[in-house]
Structures are given as structure tokens and as C-alpha cells.
Amino acid sequence: MATTPTAAAFSITLDCRLDNVPGTLGRLALAIGEAGGNIGALDGFDVRGPELRRCIVVHCRDEAHQQKVVEAVRSLKGVTLVDWWDRTFRMHEAGKIHVLTSAPVNDRDDLSMAYTPGVARVCMAIHNDPSLSHRYTIRKNTVAIVSNGTAVLGLGDIGPEAAMPVMEGKALLFKEFGGVDGFPICINARTADEVVDFVERLAPTFGGINLEDIKAPECFEIEERLKASLDIPVFHDDQHGTAVVTLAALWNSLKITGKKMEDLSVVIAGMGAAGVAIGKILINAGVGEIVGCDRTGAIYAGRSDLNAAKQWFAENTNPSRKMGSISDVMHGADVFVGVSGPGLITAADLRNMAKAPIVFAMANPDPEIRPEQADGLAAVMATGRSDYPNQINNVLAFPGLFRGALDVNATD
């Protein structure tokens, strides 16, 4: 079985004090390597007489591997491990975003325009013409990132507090890649009625609503109701952002493999928000055959345990009524699209696919099959992770989509 590679997501920083004698640094580097760590960076030396002080960044495989590297360093003669920390957790301390001002307040004139009395004039202008709120307030460039934490990445229903790091990351990416001010709002709301009511009350503050990590089937109802009731764009990124980047990746993959959209047989693993939306966009793109699978197996017309979203999927896909497990329906398929969970498929499944198979294993944080396991078996191999080549992630779509929507004051 392929060894899980080291990654920045599990990297650590080692703050070390070394005896200032030849060979000490070499022994330290060797110990890290023998423990399976991959040195990512060496900070500059701080020479203090008979001692050297430096920080070393080491990429590890997982948290257990982090501890193995730490213990290897601690056991070295002539090296003292002063401190160490997980770089991912360190990045998240106190959050990843903060609020900045865009207007100066250098004197009384500035203050009188930014706040009272001058602000009252702007308030009344908006009162007389509410559309001016998109010009004279943060609505012009601000999106609410709303989640109830019921379907976070591949982690599941982990709650609103635990969803916050993802939503903060989303806000960071909105700003970095689209210049959009996104604000994370994680709410303690379980039902569709609660989420809809909250967002409707919140809407006057924002120029758009990005729904995120809300479980199916509630997410479908929530988006439909909000689109009908609000006059600003409402976008469920798990559905449409993922669908957009999947179709883009498939178009490019066809250029490599020489296959045609209308001839494809596509298997989609995962019938939540993303899987259903991907199916819909592939239907519109003209894909020849689509078979969806959930935990029970293939989705087909006549299956008795389907919710409304899956029922629609059954009626509009899988014309041959293929049945069985994910492995069964992957026989002869051209494309595998995974939006489910880790380790779902094997190398044997890829061998059973059609010639030059296209594999999109997009489960996060861990894919349905790792690229190392698919090496030499797939014509195109992609994941949803940013530390592998060929990333298919909605971060490639949502900043630009909202940038455009805000710029034209879109209402849908």
C-alpha cells in the first residue's frame, strides 16, 4: 500500500538549540529524515557563543508522525528542543481574518463625515432610495458566508463552532482571489425554517449570500426559498461552485483523453448537495450516461428509499437502471467523480474502468483514492486538495462568481 506523503497541512516548526560544533546540524537533519520527516525550511542561525539557535519547518504525514519526529529530535545528543508547534493550528490562532477601515479619521472633519452629524445625510438618502445601500455601505462588496455546520467538508455534522475555521478560510479566499469582503456567520439552526428566517433578517447588511456546508436535503429547500424571497444573489457553493469546477475540469480532461462528452459514462459517488448539482450540470453539458451512488449503492428509478432530490436524480439519470455497489457500476465507466468520503474506491476499481479513465476524487480532507494509489492507472487524476496537482475545488470559482455578481448589482 502506498505511503501517505508528508504535507504542509501537518507541518511543524521545531525550535532547536544546538551545540556549536561540526556535525550537530547534520545529525539533526539526518534524524528528522530517518523519522520520515521532510524538511521544508531552515530559518537563519542565531549564534550565541557555544550554541546555535534555529527553527526548522518539517512536513509530516499526520499527528502521530509529528510526535515521532519530535521524539527523534528530543533524543539527539547536543540538541535541545526548546519548543515545537503545529503550523496549521498556529495559523488559526485568534482566527484568520480581521476588520480593517477604508476611511481615514485623522481630524474632526473626518469624524463629522464618517459619523454624526454627516452620516445622517447618507442614512436619509438610503431611506428615500434603498438601492443606494449598495453604493454607500459595505453591501457593495460584502458577502455573508452562512453555515449551520451540518455537512462540513467530509467531516459531517460537527456543529457551528467547529465549522468556523472553514468559513474563516472561505472569507480569506474571497478577499485574496476576488477582492470580496466575506464574513463568516455560523448559526445554531437545524431546520430549513430556522436558517431561512435568519438569513432573511440578515440580508439587508450584505450584497450576497453564500450558503456553505448545510446538509442535504435541507440545503436544496433553503436555497430555493431564499432565492425566491431575496433580491440579492444566493449561492450554495457546495452545489454550484463544485459543479462549475467539475465541469471545467472534465472539459479539459477530454482534451487530454480525446473522449467526447456525449460518449461518456460517468459514475458519481455521493448524492448530497455536491453530487446532485454535479449530475445536473453534466446532464446540461450533454454527458451520455450518468450513474449516481449513495451509501446504499446505485441510484435508479424504482428504488424505494430515495428522498426528493435523489428521486429526481433517479428519474433523470441511469437510463439502463444499473444496480449494485460503487464497484459494480464503475465497470467500464469513463469517469469517476467522488464527492463522498475517504478510501471509497481501490486500484482494482480503476483497472475495471474504460481505457484512459478520468478520476476526480474530490472528498475533503481525504480523497476517495489517493493519487499514489492511482499512479499509472488513470489518464487524469485530480483531487479536491490544494497540496496535490490537479486540484478541483470550488475556490477556483466562487471568488470570481461573486466578484462579478457584486460588480453588476445582480439580484439573482
Model-predicted segments: where are they?
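A conserved regulatory-domain signal marking ACT and ACT-like small-molecule sensing domains
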Residues: 1-93
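Short glycine/serine/threonine-rich phosphate/pyrophosphate-binding segments
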Residues: 24-25, 137, 153-155, 195, ...
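A short, aliphatic-rich alpha-helical micro-motif
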Residues: 203, 261, 329-330, 350-353, ...
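Adenosine-phosphate binding glycine-rich loop
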Residues: 233, 237-238, 257-263, 363-412
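ADP-ribose/adenylate-binding Rossmann-like module
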Residues: 210-213, 337-391
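Glycine/serine-rich phosphate-binding loop and adjoining beta1-alpha1 elements at the start
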Residues: 81-264
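Glycine-rich phosphate/diphosphate-binding loop of Rossmann-like nucleotide-binding domains
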Residues: 153, 158-178, 230, 236, ...
